[in-house]
Amino acid sequence: MDLNTLLETTVVGLGYELVDVEMSPRGRTIRVFIDAPAKETGIDVEDCAKVSNQLTRVFEVENFDFDRLEISSPGLDRVVKKAADFERFSGQEIQIKVRIPQGGRRNFQGELLGLKDGKVGLRLAKDDVELEFTNIEKARLVPRFD
């Protein structure tokens, strides 16, 4: 079983959402970002400890070698990757970087309008744009401090 499948199965099985995974260049440190959409208070230390303990056991059973495992909440500027995320965070400020420039630009920031027919809607200062979901390289929420 590959690492991503192992992580997804374990994290979802514990009732959390796997948001993102980062690995150090040599693969010795694994950073796992989890969320609990059903929980109003978000992720806390107990949630991280629960996932860490379970993943450590699973890695031992699967004989997966690593030096360090870090479990964290996705933070205020969380990564937005899955199609469902682009719907869930509709109405929020987002930064998007595309692989292939659109209108001479690769970077966009504006209000997320959602995902429809494979296109992500974005309200910019002057107009609205639609970006191909498959062309998105990276997307992050932009925290607001009002």
Curated annotation (Swiss-Prot):
Family according to the record: Belongs to the RimP family.
Keywords: Cytoplasm, Ribosome biogenesis
Recorded name of the encoding gene: rimP
Name listed for the protein in its UniProt record: Ribosome maturation factor RimP
InterPro entries registered for this protein in UniProt: Ribosome_maturation_RimP, RimP_C, RimP_C_sf, RimP_N, RimP_N_sf
Function: Required for maturation of 30S ribosomal subunits.
Source superkingdom: Bacteria
Broad class of where this protein is predominantly found: cytoplasm
Biological process, per Gene Ontology: ribosomal small subunit assembly; translation
A GO CC term assigned to this protein in UniProt: cytosol
Pfam families: DUF150_C, RimP_N
Annotated compartments: Cytoplasm
